[in-house]
Amino acid sequence: MIPVLICVLISLSAADNDLDTLYPELEHSRTIYVTENGPQLSVMAEQSKVVSRRGGNATLPCKIQRDQSLAPNRKMRIKWTKLTSDYLKEVDVFVVMDYHKRSYGSFHGRVHLQGSSPMDASLVITEITLEDYGRYKCEVIDGLEDGTVVVSLDLEGVIFPYYPRLGRYNLNFYDAVRACHDQDAIVASFDQLYDAWRGGMDWCNAGWLNDGTVQYPITNPREPCGGKNTVPGIRNYGLRDKDKNHYDVFCFTSHYKGRFYYLIHPSKLTYDEAVRACQKDGAEIAKVGQMYAAWKLLGYDRCDAGWLADGSVRYPISSPRRRCSPTEAAVRFSGFPDKKHKLYGVYCFKGNN
């Protein structure tokens, strides 16, 4: 092996000599090592996810580390944006530079920097709404130096499948957004559906998610739901046409400020009578999302079927018992009966002013 290596080295040396003879004007190349200082400014977050609830406050961490060799710069710019679910664009939230500050859109008057030190760019969000859920980017620009970090704002809440009176698979994506909004909810994210599936959610009807995909969670594989011999998981139809394709939707809601209750009334009610009865009690007929929030987050339990705002009849069971969801805790669904039927009570909601 050594003689072979010596021969190779001799051959390479001879080749170099031949080049020198043939091209005397050719300069020998030299390897130049360039050293570069590391970034003089960096941005970091102590935690990548913050959990809060609707109506609460949250602080999204963003700390600046700045090289001492950098000259003081009063023009450092801090900008917070919210990333859309498909990451295709950013929504302005808050910008500050020197003494100039500005908040945008629905965040106006609800956001400010924590400012515990000159190097603290953490964002405080107050009176959190359902729409605040998502990922936020903190961007710091200091002269030619810049840095970014992304922090998620998660909400305590509950996910629920939904379809309207028209029946299953009647919602395009934009209809789905409106349907969830009408029920005091937003279209759920994949992360929220995944968490619900891990918690035991099993639902065999495909529904829209906020990224434009259509999926459904299966914990008990069976033939009509992706196949009996498949593993549990979230079945994924992928991205669908938001205008042309029609499915159900998975909605998400969180804590509310107010009181959800079953109205004690001397007789059963038609839908219109139910609406008026809640109004007479200083409330409004409750929405599906409010029932799910009361059931999941507050343990509300009532074995009386009652009208809700969308014309459906449901009742929430937290303690399974005979004749009241004997096998599991759930919001039981009695369908969309004729609104003239005088067969049900009503659930009302009274918000806190």
Predicted features along the sequence, with ranges:
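N-terminal signal peptide
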Residues: I2, I6-V43, I159-F160
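Conserved Ig-like domain signature around the intradomain disulfide
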Residues: A58, E131-E139, Y247-D248, Y344
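Core motif of extracellular immunoglobulin-like domains
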Residues: C62, W80, Y136-C138, C180, ...
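Conserved hydrophobic ligand-interaction patch in extracellular adhesion modules
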Residues: F173-G200, Y262-P266, Y271-R302
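Extracellular disulfide-stabilized recognition modules
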Residues: G109, E156-Y174, C204-G207, R222-L269, ...
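Extracellular/luminal immunoglobulin-like beta-sandwich modules
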Residues: E27-R30, Q68-M76, E139-G157, F252
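N-terminal V-set
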Residues: Q68-H108, D191-Q192, G289
